[in-house]
Amino acid sequence: NNMKKKNKIVKIIAILVLIILVIGTGLYIKRRNNYIYITQFSPTTSRQMMGYAIKTLNGKIVVIDGGLQEDAKQLEKYITDNGGEVDTWFITHPHIDHAGAFEIISQNTSIKINKIYMSIEDKDWYLTNEPSRTIDIEEFFKVINQEKIAEKIIEPQVNDIIKIDNITAKILGTKNPEITTNAINNSSMVIQIQVN
């Protein structure tokens, strides 16, 4: 009789452990599916650059800056390997080490870009406040003034919330025309990314 009780208790414990394992595994898989994948690209030259890509829960691609023109190939490969489409592209500011890859990819590839968020001053402001960047600024504005690009540009405001699948981007800072020292860097868009 005691042996039957012990066997019954062992069976109940085994069933409970199995249930806990199944539920735990299911919760782990559910949490795991909420992950995003963030890629920080390395420079392909000896020069500095900044480029990130985020792959959301449903496989949407979000790019932040992208790097130099010379870095475009690695970013293009990443985007192509992940479906060939950028849902949202954030350009923080028009320095070539941030926006150069965007200039190349938006002009010379079949990659589809749906939305482009940037907070940009007019061209004369950049030319006045950082004349040493004239060539870069001229090239950048030549690209963004093309109809196929201009129609996709959205200028966010501070505290705007942009939802892309399971991520939320909050705009913390935008252009600052009153700051003319290190003007382009100090007029960068600042974005906070949160995973939901």
Protein language model regions, located:
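Short Gly/charged-rich anion-binding patches and loops
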Residues: 74, 100, 139-142, 157
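Short, flexible/disordered intra-domain loops and linkers
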Residues: 124-135
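Conserved glycine-bearing catalytic or ligand-binding loops at nucleotide- and phosphate-handling centers
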Residues: 133-151, 155
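Alpha-helical transmembrane signal-anchor helices
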Residues: 14, 18-28
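N-terminal Sec-pathway targeting helices
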Residues: 3-18
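Core dinuclear metal-dependent hydrolase active-site scaffold
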Residues: 24-84, 149-196
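Active-site metal-binding motif and surrounding structural segment of the metallo-beta-lactamase
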Residues: 57-62, 69-122
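Intrinsically disordered, low-complexity coil segments
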Residues: 41-50, 107-112, 127-129, 146-148
